[in-house]
Amino acid sequence: MHKDVKEILFLEEDLKKIVERLGKQITKDYEGKNLLLVCVLKGSVCFMADLMRAIELDCRIDFMDAKSYGNSTVTNGVVSISRDLNYDISDYDIIIVEDIFDSGRTLEKLTQVLSARGPRSVACCSLLDKPERRAQGVELKLDYTGAQVPDAFVVGYGLDYDEKYRNLPYIGILKPEVYSN
């Protein structure tokens, strides 16, 4: 375990089981559809790479970079999109692939932006859900959820603090003294 991690929540084996479960469900739900997975950079990259291999259907992938954190541990409430899709999505069933559903503002904004472009459908898949942190007024519900996590700062498997810890093969709780200095 990394010296800055207080506790491990999900080991590699746990994450693999979560991804396999989600992949099977998406495969069942999207049979015969024109699937486009949209990865929200950067935190979702590990999850997306594993999830797309667990989906037993043809699918396209693309990437968006959107965030509401900046370099902080608390959302500032403003969602900025710095990288957009390369596809005309009007003929696709979209699944937005997110690392963590926290305040909900990022996913809500992306859902609104993509829905306005006229795809066949837009769904949301998040590896982690942190319901205690949901922002007031966010009504978006996840279509696919990997697991719930406590109201703590989590890192690993793509999730970071200040661009560190993304490469950890597990998800753990970061020690508060690391980010409170």
Residue ranges and their predicted role:
Residues 1-181:
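PRPP-associated nucleotide enzymes
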